[in-house]
UniProtKB/Swiss-Prot annotation:
It catalyses: NAD(+) + (deoxyribonucleotide)n-3'-hydroxyl + 5'-phospho-(deoxyribonucleotide)m = (deoxyribonucleotide)n+m + AMP + beta-nicotinamide D-nucleotide. Its EC number is 6.5.1.2. DNA ligase that catalyzes the formation of phosphodiester linkages between 5'-phosphoryl and 3'-hydroxyl groups in double-stranded DNA using NAD as a coenzyme and as the energy source for the reaction. It is essential for DNA replication and repair of damaged DNA. Belongs to the NAD-dependent DNA ligase family. LigA subfamily. The gene is ligA. The active site is at K134 (n6-amp-lysine intermediate). Its cofactor is Mg(2+); Mn(2+). This is DNA ligase. It is an enzyme of class 6 (ligase). One of its GO terms (molecular function) is DNA ligase (NAD+) activity. SUPFAM superfamilies: BRCT domain, DNA ligase/mRNA capping enzyme, catalytic domain, Nucleic acid-binding proteins, RuvA domain 2-like. Gene3D superfamilies: 5' to 3' exonuclease, C-terminal subdomain (1.10.150.20), BRCT domain (3.40.50.10190), DNA ligase/mRNA capping enzyme (3.30.470.30), Helix hairpin bin (1.10.287.610), Nucleic acid-binding proteins (2.40.50.140). InterPro entries: BRCT_dom, BRCT_dom_sf, DisA/LigA_HHH, DNA_ligase, DNA_ligase_AS, DNAligase_adenylation, DNAligase_N, NA-bd_OB-fold.
Length: 716
């Protein structure tokens, strides 16, 4: 899976009230169903495996404490996701269930203990386990009748999958006819379709050159390659298959899991060579550690190891519980670390001129994702110094050419957690942090001050909007959803227009159509008459803009959406705001005092406004833009609404409007929206997933509303 999902709750399950548990159970159920669909149907996971496991762990813990919440369609009772509808459906004769997870050695000991108790074994009875790496690929069931492959189906929701027979026939690891004699009439062989890391990198290079989809990780590329309507596309992709299980069998050719693995090999299948027979908990844990040590060296992704009771008659006695077998478990790996070489360090310049050093890595798989870039934060971080002056990595600095250890803790953004000094080459290069901006202007770089007036760790270019790097980032902000929100003008299009010299400042966006007779945009690759017409219509639709959005779109430092709204409400019109800004820039004490008196406006914002409007270049940008755009007066908050002057906090997931919409509506009706609950809070609007803020509301005696009650209160 891909990126992480931050947990929306902080209350321990043991501390949840029944009402809180019910709300969170519903939210987690919906979230898990969504991620199952993205993973199993669309091959486009939005969170990492570790983050998904954490969600499911919490969900299961809630159901364990409140068993009355469990329902037939609960994610704890189902597997995967329903077939997508792109392929013919196939009913599994024997359901394809998933394994329960173990995250700690204690979980493995509990697993073995449960089996011994269930089978009523004596203390000296030994249980043999077949242990194997857990391949991170796409589960597949292959049905053979009379030794011939007749159907290949994906897992789907465990009961029903998708027919991908034509595509599976293109895999060299899948025999069309089983080898050997005296084969059972019906054999269902199950295993994992995967793509090697090397093949994945090569495929992405070809995809990039062809302008096609770039896959996030080998698992996604394997799934996407297999679920093609055209089998020739699948045939062109280097997919492998490991056999490790079975489904419907008219006769069993072996009495043990390990015996079945050998039989798969005799039939012509590839099995994982690291599979091993273990006879104790200690051997299982040693196997897990050994595989984890080899993980980075393997040419395919794994996310844990699997333990299965070896004796098939014991597997049958143990049976299943809900969606998982009692006889098997997946022992997952912790947040993955990987070693790689830092090839270079590049500087990225942000919209406000902030410098961010980015490490360029030899591509390496971490947590199911190929990582090539890593943020190095700032100059001090590279030197081994933290934001508060603390020592990082025992003071080891980061040099170009170093072997570094990177980690996706919780599988979030990769970070450098260590530098291997013993692997440092003699020619490792100390990174010289630039004192001039890398832009053509080569303007000076300064270190920002902290709130205490001390030198901070963040470096910034002083070129402002004359700096082309800042220009392009400002243009991206200007067209973004929270500013002018111009449909069809995303970051990619802005970059293209900027590189071509067609859009250098915001006003240029509104003159594109006028200049198109010369530009001939419809002749540019990727555009046509219809798309160009749609773009121009979208631009025209933004010729009128709310004052707060306009102020935000100017991109002044420290002026985010909330501050922009406060300024818009404080001055009411563009004319009044513009006049005040010019006076503030000229040091007019009365104007400065008036701005300082506004709600949520302080010295930092005033300095930023003064600096912005004190520059001739910026005033020119604003003047040219206001010739193209009509700026609407700020909407005055309704003072007669039931929430006028009230303080509102939103928490949890809102289902009938986005958080931004709810915030905007509340502010339009005269309320103040806060991010935390205090004695001054009037209402907490709680949706599914509401966590600690509900407890805070109870502590302070604040009224809690559901989303429906909130909408009823405001009359919407």
């Amino acid at each position: 899976m891909a990126k992480t999902a931050k947990s929306k709750q902080s209350v321990d399950v043991a501390d949840l009230t029944k009402a809180q548990a019910k709300v969170e159970w519903k939210r987690l159920a919906l979230e898990l169903e969504t991620h199952d669909r993205l993973y199993y149907q669309e091959d486009a996971p939005k969170i990492s495996d570790a983050a998904y496991d954490e969600l499911r762990r919490r969900f299961n813990a809630i159901e364990k404490r409140f068993p009355e919440l469990v329902s037939r369609d609960s994610p704890s009772q189902t597997v995967g996701a329903a077939p997508s509808g792109r392929f013919k459906k196939v009913r599994h004769a024997v359901p394809m269930l998933s394994l329960d997870n173990a995250f700690a050695e204690e979980d493995v000991r509990d697993f073995v203990g449960r089996i011994a108790r269930f089978l009523k074994l004596a203390e000296d009875d030994r249980i043999a386990f077949s242990a194997e790496p857990k391949i991170d690929g796409l589960s597949m069931s292959l049905r053979y009748e009379g030794g011939q492959l007749v159907t290949a189906a994906t897992r789907g929701d465990g009961a029903e999958g998708e027919d991908v027979t034509a595509n599976i026939r293109t895999l060299k690891d899948v025999p069309q006819k089983l080898h050997g004699r005296n084969l059972p009439d019906i054999c269902e062989i199950r295993g994992e379709v995967y793509m090697t890391k090397q093949a994945f990198l090569a495929l992405n290079e070809r995809q990039k050159e062809a302008g096609d989809t770039i896959f996030a990780n080998p698992r996604n590329s394997a799934a996407g390659s297999l679920r093609q309507k055209d089998p020739t596309i699948t045939a062109s992709r280097p997919l492998g298959f490991f056999a490790y299980a079975w489904g419907d069998m008219s006769a069993m050719p072996a009495e043990t899991q390990s015996g079945m693995i050998k039989w798969f090999e005799h039939c012509g299948f590839t099995t994982n060579p690291l599979t091993k027979l273990c006879h104790s908990v200690e051997e299982l844990i040693a196997f897990h550690r050994a595989i984890e040590e080899q993980r980075a060296e393997l040419d395919y992704d794994i996310d844990g190891v699997v333990y299965k009771v070896d004796r098939i008659d014991w597997q049958e006695r143990l049976g299943f519980v809900s969606r998982t077998p009692r006889w098997g478990i997946a022992h997952k790996f912790p947040a993955e670390r990987a070693m790689t070489v830092l090839k270079d360090i590049e500087i990225q310049v942000g919209r406000t001129g902030s410098f961010t050093p980015v490490g360029k890595l030899e591509p390496v798989g971490v947590g199911g994702v190929i990582v090539q870039n890593v943020t190095l934060h700032n100059e001090d971080y590279i030197k081994g110094i933290g934001n508060k002056g603390e020592v990082l990595r025992e003071g080891r600095d980061i040099r170009i050419g170093d072997t570094v250890v990177i980690q996706r803790a919780g599988d979030v953004i990769p970070q450098v957690v260590d530098v291997l000094i013993d692997k440092r080459p003699a020619d490792a290069e100390v990174f010289a942090f630039p004192r001039k901006c890398p832009c053509p202007l080569h303007t000076d770089v300064v270190r920002e001050e902290t709130a205490a007036g001390e030198e901070g760790s963040r470096a910034r270019c002083t070129g402002e909007f004359a700096c082309p790097y800042q220009k392009i980032e400002h243009l991206k902000l200007f067209a973004s959803r929270r500013a002018f929100d111009i449909d069809g003008l995303g970051e990619k299009q802005i970059q293209f227009f900027f590189d071509e010299g067609w859009v250098k400042e915001p006003a240029d966006i509104f003159t594109l159509q006028k200049r198109n007779a010369k530009l001939k945009l419809e002749e540019v690759e990727g555009y046509g008459e219809t798309s160009v017409r749609n773009l121009f219509n979208a631009i025209e639709a933004r010729r009128e803009m709310a004052l707060e959005r306009f102020i935000y779109a100017l991109g002044m430092r420290y002026v985010g959406e909330t501050t922009a709204l406060a300024l818009a409400r404080g001055y009411g019109s563009w004319e009044a705001f513009h006049d005040a800004c010019l006076k503030v820039a000229n040091g007019d004490e009365e104007a400065i005092a008036e701005m300082d008196a506004l709600d949520q406006i302080g010295e930092t914002v005033i300095k930023s406004v003064a600096a912005y409007f004190g520059e001739d270049h910026n005033r020119g940008i604003v003047e040219r833009l206001t010739r193209e755009v009509k700026i609407l007066d700020a909407e005055k908050p309704k003072r007669n609404s039931p929430i006028a002057t009230k303080t509102v906090v939103f928490t949890g997931t809102l289902e009938k409007m986005t958080r931004d919409e709810a915030k905007a509506t509340a502010e339009r009706l005269g309320a103040k929206v806060s991010g935390s609950v205090s004695k001054k809070t009037d209402y907490v609007v709680a949706g599914p997933g509401a966590g600690s803020k509900l407890k805070d509301a109870e502590k302070h005696g604040v009224k809690v509303l559901t989303e429906d009650e909130w909408l009823q209160l405001i009359g919407e």
